[in-house]
Amino acid sequence: MDPAAAADVLHRTLKDPKRPITVADASVESGLPLRDAEAGLTWLTSEYRGHLRVTEDGDLVHLFAHGFEKL
């Protein structure tokens, strides 16, 4: 799947874009395969100035402090 198309699916299905989300969680919420969820989150991170963080448990999470709004 094209990263922009995967991002569109994630944009429509993620319940709370302001909370930290892992690729696995995005995959479960959206129904996308892991590969597509990762590509979509990467696209959204670039498009909406998201950030990547590592949790204390070592999980990589995507953060969108302003949700899916362009500033």
Q: Which residues does each predicted region cover?
A:
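A composition-biased, non-transmembrane "mature-region" signal
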Residues: 1-71
